Swiss-Prot record:
Gene3D superfamilies: 3.40.1360.10, 6.10.250.240, RecR Domain 1. GO terms for biological process: DNA recombination; DNA repair. This is Recombination protein RecR. SUPFAM superfamilies: Recombination protein RecR. The gene is recR. Residues 80-175 form the Toprim domain. Signal peptide: none annotated. Pfam families: RecR_C (PF21175), RecR_HhH (PF21176), RecR_ZnF (PF02132), Toprim_4 (PF13662). A zinc finger (C4-type) spans 57-72. GO terms for molecular function: DNA binding; zinc ion binding. It comes from Alkalilimnicola ehrlichii (strain ATCC BAA-1101 / DSM 17681 / MLHE-1). Transmembrane segments: none annotated. Belongs to the RecR family. InterPro entries: DNA_Rcmb_RecR, Rcmb_RecR, Rcmb_RecR_Znf, TOPRIM_dom, TOPRIM_RecR.
Length: 199
């Protein structure tokens, strides 16, 4: 059913969010219009301001309102450690879950030749230039354990090795609290092969 042009536009606009289909977008639109107009206005203002003011850090490419993010600007970070991630959300996840004190480089994706995503689309030339500066002593690869993520990690490892930079990969395996019988065979095989001494 078609509603008024403005309601249709709102519903269609909400569908740009990941995981939001037509029914969810319709429910959200009606909720904002019927029950939370102030919340809708705050949401609209927050979206507008974020879209206008948030960009990418010119050093690590994480989302920030400043030319250089707080992580890169901090003198408390270990500049010899560089963790390479696929997206800005990965930086926030690692910052919340780990005590990593190094810096980051955000790829904004992963290599995917079938989709036309090559090294230049990921800014790997910028990463290579950063490695050439000589400050980075270890690159920590924190890409997804997918075919594309592994290919991306392999490509970056080659760049790092050419510069004599140590390269490590985050461990993948059985999640905390997970039952072995429910873990897929690829994950289980990878976890078993990557076993370490028990202290």
């Amino acid at each position: 059913m078609r509603y008024s042009p403005l309601i249709d536009q709102l519903i269609e606009s909400l569908r740009c969010l990941p995981g939001v289909g037509p029914r969810s977008a319709q429910r959200m639109a009606f909720h904002l219009l019927q029950r939370d107009r102030d919340g809708g206005r705050r949401l609209a203002t927050a979206i507008r301001e974020a879209m206008d003011q948030v960009g990418h850090c010119r050093q690590c490419r994480v989302l920030t309102e400043e030319p250089v993010c707080g992580l890169c600007a901090s003198d408390r970070r270990d500049r010899s450690l560089l963790c390479v991630v696929e997206g800005p959300a990965d930086v926030f996840a690692l910052e919340q879950a780990t005590d990593f004190r190094g810096l980051y480089f955000v790829l904004m994706g992963r290599l995917s030749p079938l989709d036309g995503v090559g090294p230049e689309a990921l800014g790997l030339d910028r990463l290579e230039a950063r490695l050439a500066e000589g400050e980075v002593q270890e690159v920590i690869l924190a890409t997804s354990p997918t075919v594309e993520g592994e290919a991306t990690s392999h490509y970056i490892a080659e760049l790092a090795h050419q510069r004599g930079v140590r390269t490590t990969r985050i461990a993948h395996g059985v999640p905390m609290g997970g039952e072995l019988e429910y873990v897929d065979s690829g994950t289980l095989s990878h976890a078993f092969a990557g076993r370490r001494d028990y202290d």
